[in-house]
Amino acid sequence: MLQAVAPSHLAPLGAPPGPRAVVVLGAGKIGRTIARMLHGTGDYAVTVVDRDAPQLAGMPAGIAVRQADPTAAGACIALLDGAWAVLNALPFHAATAVATAAAELGVHYFDLTEDVAATHAIRQLAPGARSVLMPQCGLAPGFIGVVGHDLARRFLRDGGELLSLRMRVGALPRYPSNALKYNLTWSTEGLINEYCNPCEAIVGGRRVEVPALEGLESFALDGIEYEAFNTSGGLGTLPETLAGRARDVDYKSIRYPGHCAAMKLLLDDLRLRERRDWLRDIFDSAIPQTEQDVVVIFATATGRTRAGQGPLVQASFSARIGGTETDAGHVNAIQLTTAAGICTALDLVATGVLPQSGFVRQEAMPLDAFLANRFGRQYTCHPLEETAA
């Protein structure tokens, strides 16, 4: 169930009291969920921008709407002028342009991108920035980086040794019924990006790139069988943060068994990797969307808490998160978790927990502060049990 998001009556840092003006770019399912979450607190004055008028219909009273194309040349500057923060829920290819406008205006910037190149470009804007630039604020990348860093810190804080850190996340249909055993619950473009682009990892203490769809493994959680394989972008900036401090770090997407083989047929044998536009059209026309989904999160770290001493120790985090009903209707699991991630990042900047300018990594958020946050507590769920598949 969606936990109530109570007002906190934020005390603005160096600004007069009152709701902070935030702009949400993109009125898709996740953008609308973000807007409703923030508006419900009373601490944020929310404006939602989308180029399509039908997407803006039905917003709750009190949320301002504006029909405009934020990707049009020069439009973003006008849309963000006077805002305290912008939350970018547009496709990944819009990230750099929006972040550039935000940095120019001194507006705090948050996004959901999984695109590694976009994140690198945004980081180049950070030197001398007057505002926060914080990409990758969703589920993966996003929350999983917060979890991974917390697990790693348990071993490294007292001079210990981190041997492996495995992070696994899946946004899955509850009732798979096709050969892919998959339904669309989020951005098709983002999904294809994850399946086609190189994946960052740490192997043998060295930062490397590994191919997507490789590294297939099988396991079970709470008696349900899954597979997991390399996908791009899920680690965010964690490989850089843990470089030279961990032996092996990787991220894989969780799917039902058989999905990886089917995707290799499409991408490699049929060469749709070379025609991503075709693949997007096929997915959008042939794979049903679903509101009946579940998010599965599983992360495990192994090492020694004191350098060269003591027994080998394992620490884990796991959760299964479903959708929920709200006054505005059903919110599915991927919408809930993604929106909660970016809203928590915004809140932690607003309350001074995070830095107030420059590039901010996801792992800068302490896990306990994240889960205690009024938005972040959506992630507090019953842990899962792993068994060999």
Pin down the residues of each PLM region.
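C-terminal catalytic/substrate-binding lobe primarily of soluble NAD(P)-dependent oxidoreductases
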Residues: L2-L10, R154-A389
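Rossmann-fold NAD(P)-binding glycine/threonine-rich loop
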Residues: L112-P135
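Conserved Rossmann-fold cofactor-binding substructure of NAD(P)-dependent oxidoreductases
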Residues: P70-G82
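Rossmann-fold cofactor-recognition segment
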Residues: P60-A72
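Helix N-cap at the beta1-alpha1 junction of Rossmann-like dinucleotide-binding domains, i.e.
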Residues: D52-Q55, V116
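N-terminal Rossmann-fold NAD(P) dinucleotide-binding loop
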Residues: G31-R32
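Conserved N-terminal Rossmann-fold NAD(P)-binding element of oxidoreductases
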Residues: V22-G26
